[in-house]
Amino acid sequence: MIDDARAYNSDDDWSLLGSVSYMGSFESGLALVVAVTAAEMFSQGNWQRVYASNNDESLRRGAFLAAAMVFPLVFVMGFLGTVAAGQGGVGDPTIAFFYVIDESNFLVAPVLIVLVVSLVCSSADTLQNAIVASFSRDISDGVLSLKSCRVATIAMIPMAIYLASGPTIIGFEFNALSVFGIFLFADMLAAATVSPVLMALWGKVSSRGAFLGCLAGFSSVALYGLIEPPADSQFYMYIIHPTGGAVPASEGGLTNLWAFVSAIIGSAIATVVGSYALPDE
């Protein structure tokens, strides 16, 4: 398959972007790791698992076991998708993996179906529990009953299914790249605030220092925009489009590593300085 990918892969700019030696692609991939990690720190599903663990050792063992199982699976899936795209026979990137296994052993498909259904059920279960927890604690602060929160979560499912069908609402098209852009914006919000929130567990961090840290997270991204200004956008647009040159993800913009790094580091430094300068009374 690798030989086929090399044979079909054209020698142009897109070939450069797909090269392992091209640092732009590597930085974009690393940026996604940083962005998703920051966003997952706010996931109620993860913290529910932490709370439900028997002890620290069980939590540590479960984390390492999950990582050992997930990493090779994600690596293989991503690699096979890249190989399929390199062969040039896939018009829709979402079916690249299935293009590769089209002529494989007939036992592969049933195994993959079971795996995919299991993954979807697990993700949906975690997501729904997290939404219920967010309604109950974060949004209503315990005012809404658990039953009401569950009903509200179930009521969101038809809207989610409708949005997944790819509609166009007020001129915005809900396709894969557009939704990816929404996720990047959400990840930027998380990256700018995750350091102050987690550092609040440290007793010396004050509430005003944490608040200033959150503001500094966004200011750091804007400062990065002044140092590396986007070609066709304002310097602050990295907050909305954290991609190379602030090009929207729907137009092919690659994730910008340094926008996320500046948000995390800037917010952390401002939190520490602000906490010492403005301690809680």
Task: Write out the residue ranges for each language-model feature.
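Membrane-embedded helix-loop-helix hairpins and adjacent transmembrane boundary segments
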Residues: M1-E281
